[in-house]
Protein backbone atom coordinates (compact mmCIF):
# COMPACT_ATOMS: atom_id res chain seq x y z
CA UNK A 1 0.00 0.00 0.00
CA UNK A 2 0.95 3.66 -0.32
CA UNK A 3 0.88 5.55 2.97
CA UNK A 4 -1.84 8.21 3.16
CA UNK A 5 -0.45 11.71 2.69
CA UNK A 6 -2.21 13.03 5.80
CA UNK A 7 -0.56 10.41 8.04
CA UNK A 8 2.90 11.11 6.63
CA UNK A 9 2.25 14.82 7.18
CA UNK A 10 1.26 14.04 10.77
CA UNK A 11 4.58 12.23 11.22
CA UNK A 12 6.46 15.15 9.64
CA UNK A 13 4.82 17.58 12.08
CA UNK A 14 5.38 15.25 15.05
CA UNK A 15 1.65 14.79 15.64
CA UNK A 16 2.03 11.79 17.92
CA UNK A 17 -1.67 11.47 18.72
CA UNK A 18 -2.75 11.43 15.07
CA UNK A 19 -0.20 8.78 14.08
CA UNK A 20 -1.01 6.64 17.11
CA UNK A 21 -4.75 6.85 16.40
CA UNK A 22 -4.18 5.79 12.78
CA UNK A 23 -2.02 2.83 13.83
CA UNK A 24 -4.49 1.81 16.54
CA UNK A 25 -7.22 1.78 13.91
CA UNK A 26 -5.48 -1.09 12.10
CA UNK A 27 -6.29 -4.69 13.16
CA UNK A 28 -2.63 -5.40 13.93
CA UNK A 29 -1.77 -1.98 15.34
CA UNK A 30 -0.30 -0.92 12.01
CA UNK A 31 2.52 -3.46 11.98
CA UNK A 32 1.73 -4.71 8.48
CA UNK A 33 1.97 -1.27 6.88
CA UNK A 34 4.34 0.64 9.15
CA UNK A 35 7.29 0.18 6.79
CA UNK A 36 5.43 1.18 3.62
CA UNK A 37 6.34 4.31 1.63
CA UNK A 38 4.25 7.31 0.68
CA UNK A 39 3.99 8.59 -2.90
CA UNK A 40 7.38 10.28 -2.53
CA UNK A 41 9.17 7.23 -1.16
CA UNK A 42 9.13 8.30 2.50
CA UNK A 43 8.40 6.05 5.50
CA UNK A 44 6.79 7.22 8.74
CA UNK A 45 10.07 6.85 10.64
CA UNK A 46 11.92 8.93 8.05
CA UNK A 47 9.15 11.52 8.04
CA UNK A 48 9.38 12.09 11.78
CA UNK A 49 13.19 12.37 11.49
CA UNK A 50 13.21 15.03 8.76
CA UNK A 51 12.75 18.08 11.00
CA UNK A 52 13.96 19.24 14.39
CA UNK A 53 11.01 21.17 15.80
CA UNK A 54 9.25 19.57 18.79
CA UNK A 55 12.25 17.28 19.44
CA UNK A 56 10.71 15.51 22.44
CA UNK A 57 7.56 14.67 20.50
CA UNK A 58 9.62 13.44 17.57
CA UNK A 59 11.65 11.09 19.75
CA UNK A 60 8.44 9.83 21.39
CA UNK A 61 6.90 9.24 17.95
CA UNK A 62 10.01 7.45 16.70
CA UNK A 63 9.94 5.24 19.80
CA UNK A 64 6.29 4.39 19.15
CA UNK A 65 7.01 3.52 15.52
CA UNK A 66 9.93 1.30 16.51
CA UNK A 67 7.77 -0.46 19.10
CA UNK A 68 5.19 -1.13 16.39
CA UNK A 69 7.81 -2.72 14.14
CA UNK A 70 9.30 0.13 12.11
CA UNK A 71 12.55 -0.93 10.42
CA UNK A 72 15.25 1.50 11.53
CA UNK A 73 17.22 0.76 8.36
CA UNK A 74 14.32 1.05 5.91
CA UNK A 75 15.53 3.66 3.41
CA UNK A 76 13.53 6.08 1.32
CA UNK A 77 12.42 4.52 -1.95
CA UNK A 78 13.78 5.73 -5.28
CA UNK A 79 10.91 4.15 -7.19
CA UNK A 80 8.69 7.24 -7.17
CA UNK A 81 11.05 10.15 -6.65
CA UNK A 82 14.82 10.25 -6.23
CA UNK A 83 15.00 13.50 -4.25
CA UNK A 84 15.45 11.62 -0.95
CA UNK A 85 18.27 9.51 -2.37
CA UNK A 86 17.63 6.34 -0.33
CA UNK A 87 18.19 8.23 2.88
CA UNK A 88 17.74 6.35 6.17
CA UNK A 89 16.30 7.64 9.47
CA UNK A 90 19.86 7.62 10.85
CA UNK A 91 21.03 9.91 8.05
CA UNK A 92 18.26 12.34 8.99
CA UNK A 93 19.13 12.27 12.69
CA UNK A 94 22.80 12.87 11.84
CA UNK A 95 22.08 16.19 10.12
CA UNK A 96 23.15 19.47 11.67
CA UNK A 97 19.58 20.71 12.23
CA UNK A 98 18.99 18.37 15.19
CA UNK A 99 20.14 20.34 18.27
CA UNK A 100 20.52 17.25 20.48
CA UNK A 101 21.47 13.64 19.92
CA UNK A 102 18.38 12.06 21.51
CA UNK A 103 16.98 10.90 18.17
CA UNK A 104 20.41 9.71 17.07
CA UNK A 105 20.85 7.68 20.26
CA UNK A 106 17.41 6.11 19.88
CA UNK A 107 18.05 5.03 16.29
CA UNK A 108 21.54 3.72 17.07
CA UNK A 109 20.17 1.71 20.00
CA UNK A 110 17.59 0.24 17.60
CA UNK A 111 20.37 -0.98 15.30
CA UNK A 112 20.76 1.89 12.84
CA UNK A 113 23.41 1.07 10.21
CA UNK A 114 26.23 3.63 10.42
CA UNK A 115 27.77 2.31 7.19
CA UNK A 116 24.68 2.74 4.99
CA UNK A 117 25.12 5.15 2.08
CA UNK A 118 22.56 7.28 0.32
CA UNK A 119 22.12 6.96 -3.46
CA UNK A 120 22.84 10.60 -4.24
CA UNK A 121 19.33 11.94 -4.79
CA UNK A 122 20.05 14.90 -2.52
CA UNK A 123 23.34 15.62 -4.29
CA UNK A 124 25.66 13.45 -2.18
CA UNK A 125 26.41 9.79 -1.61
CA UNK A 126 27.28 9.59 2.06
CA UNK A 127 27.17 7.68 5.32
CA UNK A 128 25.55 9.14 8.46
CA UNK A 129 28.96 10.38 9.68
CA UNK A 130 29.64 11.87 6.25
CA UNK A 131 26.30 13.67 6.38
CA UNK A 132 26.99 14.95 9.89
CA UNK A 133 30.40 16.35 8.98
CA UNK A 134 29.11 17.84 5.71
CA UNK A 135 25.89 19.47 6.92
CA UNK A 136 27.53 20.97 9.98
CA UNK A 137 29.36 23.22 7.50
CA UNK A 138 26.56 25.76 7.54
CA UNK A 139 25.55 29.07 9.02
CA UNK A 140 22.75 27.26 10.83
CA UNK A 141 25.31 25.35 12.85
CA UNK A 142 27.70 28.22 13.52
CA UNK A 143 24.89 30.51 14.71
CA UNK A 144 22.32 27.89 15.67
CA UNK A 145 21.80 25.33 18.43
CA UNK A 146 24.02 22.60 16.96
CA UNK A 147 26.31 22.47 19.99
CA UNK A 148 26.09 18.69 20.30
CA UNK A 149 28.15 18.20 17.15
CA UNK A 150 31.20 16.51 18.79
CA UNK A 151 28.88 14.36 20.89
CA UNK A 152 27.10 13.16 17.75
CA UNK A 153 30.44 12.38 16.12
CA UNK A 154 31.38 10.36 19.22
CA UNK A 155 28.11 8.41 19.08
CA UNK A 156 28.62 7.53 15.41
CA UNK A 157 32.25 6.57 15.95
CA UNK A 158 31.30 4.43 18.94
CA UNK A 159 28.79 2.60 16.73
CA UNK A 160 31.53 1.71 14.24
CA UNK A 161 31.41 4.45 11.60
CA UNK A 162 34.08 4.23 8.94
CA UNK A 163 36.46 7.15 8.41
CA UNK A 164 37.30 6.77 4.72
CA UNK A 165 35.12 7.23 1.62
CA UNK A 166 32.17 8.54 3.62
CA UNK A 167 30.98 11.37 1.36
CA UNK A 168 31.15 12.29 -2.33
CA UNK A 169 29.24 14.68 -4.55
CA UNK A 170 26.96 12.77 -6.90
CA UNK A 171 28.61 14.18 -10.02
CA UNK A 172 30.96 12.66 -12.55
CA UNK A 173 34.62 12.78 -11.56
CA UNK A 174 34.07 13.64 -7.89
CA UNK A 175 36.28 11.93 -5.31
CA UNK A 176 35.21 10.42 -2.02
CA UNK A 177 36.20 12.36 1.08
CA UNK A 178 37.41 11.07 4.44
CA UNK A 179 36.29 12.30 7.85
CA UNK A 180 39.46 14.38 8.07
CA UNK A 181 38.77 16.00 4.67
CA UNK A 182 35.26 16.99 5.71
CA UNK A 183 36.41 18.33 9.06
CA UNK A 184 39.12 20.36 7.33
CA UNK A 185 36.48 21.91 5.06
CA UNK A 186 34.38 22.75 8.11
CA UNK A 187 37.35 24.46 9.77
CA UNK A 188 38.03 26.48 6.61
CA UNK A 189 34.36 27.43 6.39
CA UNK A 190 34.27 28.68 9.98
CA UNK A 191 37.26 30.93 9.46
CA UNK A 192 36.06 32.29 6.11
CA UNK A 193 32.81 33.83 7.40
CA UNK A 194 33.22 37.63 7.16
CA UNK A 195 32.26 39.81 10.09
CA UNK A 196 31.50 36.97 12.47
CA UNK A 197 31.66 37.51 16.22
CA UNK A 198 35.10 36.24 17.39
CA UNK A 199 33.46 34.46 20.32
CA UNK A 200 31.21 32.53 17.93
CA UNK A 201 34.19 31.60 15.75
CA UNK A 202 36.22 30.49 18.78
CA UNK A 203 33.37 28.29 20.00
CA UNK A 204 32.89 26.65 16.61
CA UNK A 205 36.63 26.10 16.25
CA UNK A 206 36.74 24.48 19.68
CA UNK A 207 34.01 22.02 18.66
CA UNK A 208 35.86 21.32 15.43
CA UNK A 209 39.08 20.57 17.33
CA UNK A 210 37.23 18.32 19.77
CA UNK A 211 35.70 16.28 16.96
CA UNK A 212 39.05 16.15 15.16
CA UNK A 213 40.77 14.82 18.25
CA UNK A 214 38.35 11.89 18.42
CA UNK A 215 38.61 11.15 14.71
CA UNK A 216 42.41 11.21 14.84
CA UNK A 217 42.38 9.05 17.96
CA UNK A 218 40.16 6.41 16.36
CA UNK A 219 42.24 6.53 13.20
CA UNK A 220 45.47 5.96 15.15
CA UNK A 221 44.03 3.30 17.47
CA UNK A 222 42.16 1.43 14.75
CA UNK A 223 38.79 1.37 16.51
CA UNK A 224 36.68 3.28 19.03
CA UNK A 225 37.24 0.61 21.69
CA UNK A 226 41.00 0.79 21.28
CA UNK A 227 40.81 4.58 21.38
CA UNK A 228 38.93 4.74 24.69
CA UNK A 229 41.35 2.20 26.17
CA UNK A 230 44.30 4.45 25.41
CA UNK A 231 44.34 6.02 28.91
CA UNK A 232 44.75 2.54 30.39
CA UNK A 233 47.86 1.95 28.31
CA UNK A 234 49.22 5.38 29.19
CA UNK A 235 48.68 4.75 32.90
CA UNK A 236 50.33 1.33 32.76
CA UNK A 237 53.33 2.72 30.88
CA UNK A 238 53.82 5.68 33.25
CA UNK A 239 53.16 3.53 36.33
CA UNK A 240 55.81 1.03 35.22
CA UNK A 241 58.40 3.80 34.81
CA UNK A 242 57.48 5.37 38.16
CA UNK A 243 57.67 2.01 39.96
CA UNK A 244 61.15 1.39 38.54
CA UNK A 245 62.32 4.85 39.51
CA UNK A 246 62.82 6.08 35.95
CA UNK A 247 60.15 8.77 36.15
CA UNK A 248 58.53 11.00 38.75
CA UNK A 249 54.72 11.22 38.68
CA UNK A 250 53.70 14.15 36.45
CA UNK A 251 52.66 17.30 38.25
CA UNK A 252 50.47 20.10 36.93
CA UNK A 253 49.81 19.96 33.21
CA UNK A 254 46.49 19.18 31.61
CA UNK A 255 43.49 17.57 33.28
CA UNK A 256 44.41 14.34 31.52
CA UNK A 257 48.00 14.44 32.84
CA UNK A 258 46.82 15.22 36.37
CA UNK A 259 44.46 12.25 36.21
CA UNK A 260 47.34 9.97 35.21
CA UNK A 261 49.45 11.38 38.06
CA UNK A 262 46.70 10.60 40.57
CA UNK A 263 46.36 7.01 39.39
CA UNK A 264 50.06 6.18 39.22
CA UNK A 265 50.60 7.49 42.76
CA UNK A 266 48.28 4.83 44.16
CA UNK A 267 50.34 2.09 45.76
CA UNK A 268 47.67 -0.61 45.63
CA UNK A 269 47.16 -2.30 42.26
CA UNK A 270 43.58 -3.06 43.27
CA UNK A 271 42.83 0.65 43.55
CA UNK A 272 44.48 1.33 40.20
CA UNK A 273 42.46 -1.28 38.34
CA UNK A 274 39.26 -0.16 40.07
CA UNK A 275 39.83 3.41 38.86
CA UNK A 276 40.66 2.23 35.35
CA UNK A 277 37.47 0.16 35.19
CA UNK A 278 35.47 3.41 35.34
CA UNK A 279 37.75 5.63 33.26
CA UNK A 280 36.88 6.12 29.61
CA UNK A 281 38.27 8.76 27.28
CA UNK A 282 34.76 9.72 26.13
CA UNK A 283 33.39 10.39 29.63
Regions found by a protein language model. Give the residues of each.
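Ankyrin repeat domain, specifically the short helix-to-loop turn at the C-terminus of the second helix
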Residues: 21-33, 61-72, 105-114, 154-163
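Ankyrin-repeat intra-repeat helix-capping/turn positions
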Residues: 14, 52-53, 57, 97-99, ...
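Ankyrin-repeat boundary/"N-cap" motif
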Residues: 2-8, 32-51, 75-95, 117-143, ...
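Alpha-helix N-cap/N′ positions at the starts of helices
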Residues: 2-6, 85, 148, 233, ...
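Cullin-RING E3 adaptor/co-adaptor recruitment helices
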Residues: 154, 168-283
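Alpha-helical recognition domains of nuclear gene-regulatory proteins
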Residues: 21-22, 47, 64, 92, ...
Amino acid sequence: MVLPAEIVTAAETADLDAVRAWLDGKPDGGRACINEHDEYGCTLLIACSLSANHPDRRVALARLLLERGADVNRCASDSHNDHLGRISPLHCASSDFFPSRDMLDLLLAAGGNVKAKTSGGAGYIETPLGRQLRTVRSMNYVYGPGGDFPSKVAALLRAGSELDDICVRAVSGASYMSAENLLRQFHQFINSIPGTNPTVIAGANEKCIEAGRMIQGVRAAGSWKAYIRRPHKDVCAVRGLVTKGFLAPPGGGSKYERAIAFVVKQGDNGIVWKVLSYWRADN
